[in-house]
């Protein structure tokens, strides 16, 4: 707990702080654990005032226990499951993106990560009538691509325009810009009022590796700290504001085995609750626009489950698509 200082809580004045410090009571813990009758006599302070002060400090700094039933009820009221609009992905995600969680899509360049993110943004904005923040860090987003996806969903130009208004795009090409965006967003969303256009429900970051990878390795020791700060911001945003966070990540080759693995290392692997791998190399011959999607991390479903999705069909009206489970 913190050091006692004037203004730390109502009723704690500078004169009171000086008197307490003169008797060796310098922190909140010192005051909470002290014999208040003895403190009142030695410091010449009102016993009732000290009791009231301790109650305020306990309320302000203590952790209050919750029973499991209350936590479960809170979870039910704060959690929403948002369909991605892609049937095969929803299967692997146990119905869709969960608010309060970070979901990661991993894949090599050209595997279709951005296409999936754009489809999710278009579906949430049009189909679910909710707002989306799309943070683009690799220049992969264009308004024409989003419009094309919306045109595949509805011929109504007013509906297309309404969906476009629900998708806010921010470009952040380094980690400091991205941290600023997320911190500003947390402050703005915490004060937002639900409107007819819906509240923010999905944050897409495409991609985290683009801003983090340049900071890792070599002598850049601050890189790991900045990466974990970004991780905290994303998880806090998801949990405290009940939004679903969808991020993309690159693949890298393991130095020892030579096998491909998700970038950003072991520390980052604990950030996403769910991780999907987009792979265009499985099966004999070329898959073309088809991709194999493998569930490699999940709190709800067994890992190793696979589905296939046709990226070429994601811009067409019937884009739920053929898919095969394994």
From Swiss-Prot:
Keyword terms, alphabetized: ATP-binding, DNA damage, DNA recombination, DNA repair, DNA-binding, Nucleotide-binding, Nucleus
Cellular localization per UniProt: Nucleus
GO cellular component: centrosome; chromosome, telomeric region; microtubule organizing center; Rad51B-Rad51C-Rad51D-XRCC2 complex; replication fork
A UniProt-annotated Pfam family: RAD51D_N
UniProt keyword DNA-binding, yes or no: yes
Region spans: preferentially binds ssDNA: 1-83
InterPro entries: AAA+_ATPase, DNA_recomb/repair_Rad51_C, DNA_recomb/repair_RecA-like, HRR_RAD51_Paralog, P-loop_NTPase, Rad51D_C, RAD51D_N, RecA_ATP-bd
Molecular function GO labels: ATP binding; ATP hydrolysis activity; ATP-dependent activity, acting on DNA; ATP-dependent DNA damage sensor activity; gamma-tubulin binding; single-stranded DNA binding
GO biological process: DNA strand invasion; double-strand break repair via homologous recombination; reciprocal meiotic recombination; telomere maintenance
Gene3D superfamilies in the record: P-loop containing nucleotide triphosphate hydrolases
Binding locations of ATP: 107-114
UniProt entry tagged with the keyword Oxidoreductase: no
Subunit composition and interactions: Part of the BCDX2 complex consisting of RAD51B, RAD51C, RAD51D and XRCC2; the complex has a ring-like structure arranged into a flat disc around a central channel. In the absence of DNA, the BCDX2 subcomplex XRCC2:RAD51D formed a multimeric ring structure; in the presence of single-stranded DNA it formed a filamentous structure with the ssDNA. Interacts with SWSAP1 and ZSWIM7; involved in homologous recombination repair. Interacts with BLM; required for stimulation of BLM activity by the BCDX2 subcomplex XRCC2:RAD51D.
UniProt function note: Involved in the homologous recombination repair (HRR) pathway of double-stranded DNA breaks arising during DNA replication or induced by DNA-damaging agents. Bind to single-stranded DNA (ssDNA) and has DNA-dependent ATPase activity. Part of the RAD51 paralog protein complex BCDX2 which acts in the BRCA1-BRCA2-dependent HR pathway. Upon DNA damage, BCDX2 acts downstream of BRCA2 recruitment and upstream of RAD51 recruitment. BCDX2 binds predominantly to the intersection of the four duplex arms of the Holliday junction and to junction of replication forks.
Family that this chain belongs to: Belongs to the RecA family. RAD51 subfamily.
PANTHER family tied to this protein: DNA REPAIR PROTEIN RAD51 HOMOLOG 4
Protein name per Swiss-Prot or TrEMBL: DNA repair protein RAD51 homolog 4
Organism: Bos taurus (Bovine)
């Amino acid at each position: 707990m913190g050091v006692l200082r004037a203004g730390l809580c109502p009723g704690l004045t500078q004169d009171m702080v000086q008197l307490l410090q003169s008797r060796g009571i310098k922190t909140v813990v010192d005051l909470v654990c002290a014999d208040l009758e003895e403190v009142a006599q030695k410091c010449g302070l009102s016993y009732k005032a000290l009791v009231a002060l301790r109650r305020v400090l306990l309320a302000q700094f203590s952790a209050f226990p919750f029973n499991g039933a209350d936590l479960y009820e809170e979870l039910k009221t704060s959690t929403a499951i948002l369909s991605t609009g892609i049937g095969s992905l929803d299967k692997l995600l146990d119905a869709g993106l969960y608010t309060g969680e970070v979901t990661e899509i991993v894949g090599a360049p050209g595997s279709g990560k951005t296409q999936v993110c754009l489809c999710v943004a278009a579906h949430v904005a049009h189909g679910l009538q909710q707002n989306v923040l799309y943070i683009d860090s690799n220049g992969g987003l264009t308004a024409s691509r989003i419009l094309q996806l919306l045109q595949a969903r509805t011929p109504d130009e007013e509906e297309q325009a309404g969906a476009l208004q629900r998708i806010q795009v921010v470009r952040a090409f380094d980690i400091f810009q991205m941290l600023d965006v997320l911190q500003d967003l947390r402050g703005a969303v915490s004060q937002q009022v639900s409107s007819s256009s819906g509240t923010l429900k999905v944050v897409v970051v495409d991609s985290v590796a683009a801003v983090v990878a340049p900071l890792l390795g070599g002598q850049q020791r601050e890189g790991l700290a900045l990466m974990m700060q970004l991780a905290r911001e994303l998880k806090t945003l998801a949990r405290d504001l009940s939004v679903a966070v969808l991020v993309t990540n690159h693949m890298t080759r393991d130095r020892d085995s030579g096998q491909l693995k998700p970038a950003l290392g072991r520390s980052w692997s604990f950030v996403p609750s769910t991780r999907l791998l987009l792979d265009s190399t499985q099966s004999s011959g070329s898959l073309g626009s088809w991709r194999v999607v493998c569930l490699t991390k999940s709190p709800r479903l067994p890992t190793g489950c696979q589905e296939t999705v046709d990226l070429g069909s994601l811009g067409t009206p019937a884009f739920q698509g053929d898919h095969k489970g394994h």
